[in-house]
């Protein structure tokens, strides 16, 4: 029910407190792990991917998304009605990743790119919906801004990390 409602971008999913009970954080974590595995299955149609690492990477991604959305939306730019715990934000981020489960259907190279592209935008839309609802924001634009800023920070940090591992950062050549 939570997965279907998340895929449908049902905003009432995030307003109903019974969806955020004790087990919700574990269910959100399971969605993230399955999302990571689905991504590995999709990518495995073209290149060999470490499936076990995909689950671990998904959990790390979950915490990073949750942390940035929490800090940006709750600590830096809250609305008057924004009073939410990190756990609830983290749970909502996990629920919003349910469209990623559709990546299990990317079983041929021809399907991989369109399905990954579609599900990534779908997840982004889910993050915007969930952020607006759990942070009690008045504006869709503000919700978009919080999610987009989190995305930009994550992208910058990811690119910097990869470039540092490749010794390709401009500052890595200064001696």
Where would I find each of the regions flagged by the language model?
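Detector for Asparagine
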Residues: 1, 17-19, 44, 136, ...
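Juxtamembrane boundary at the C-terminal end of a transmembrane helix
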Residues: 156-175
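Alpha-helix boundary/capping detector
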Residues: 29, 40, 115-116, 157-158, ...
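Juxtamembrane "helix-exit" motif on the non-cytosolic side of transmembrane helices
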Residues: 39-46, 106-107, 162-165
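Detector for methionine-enriched segments
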Residues: 32, 53, 112, 123, ...
């Amino acid at each position: 029910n939570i997965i279907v409602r998340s895929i449908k971008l049902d905003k009432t999913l995030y307003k109903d407190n019974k969806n955020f009970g004790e087990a919700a954080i574990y269910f959100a974590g399971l969605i993230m792990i399955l999302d990571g595995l689905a991504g590995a299955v999709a990518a495995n149609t073209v290149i060999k991917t470490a499936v076990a690492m995909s689950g671990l990477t998904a959990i790390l991604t979950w915490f990073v998304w949750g942390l940035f959305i929490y800090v940006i939306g709750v600590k830096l730019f809250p609305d008057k009605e924004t009073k939410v715990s990190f756990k609830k934000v983290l749970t909502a981020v996990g629920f919003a990743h349910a469209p990623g489960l559709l990546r299990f259907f990317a079983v041929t190279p021809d399907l991989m790119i369109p399905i990954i592209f579609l599900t990534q935008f779908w997840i982004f839309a889910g993050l915007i919906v969930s952020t607006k609802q759990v942070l009690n924001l008045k504006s869709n634009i503000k919700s978009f801004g919080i999610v987009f800023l989190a995305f930009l920070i994550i992208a910058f940090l990811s690119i910097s990390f990869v470039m540092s591992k490749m010794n390709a950062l401009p500052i890595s050549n200064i001696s």
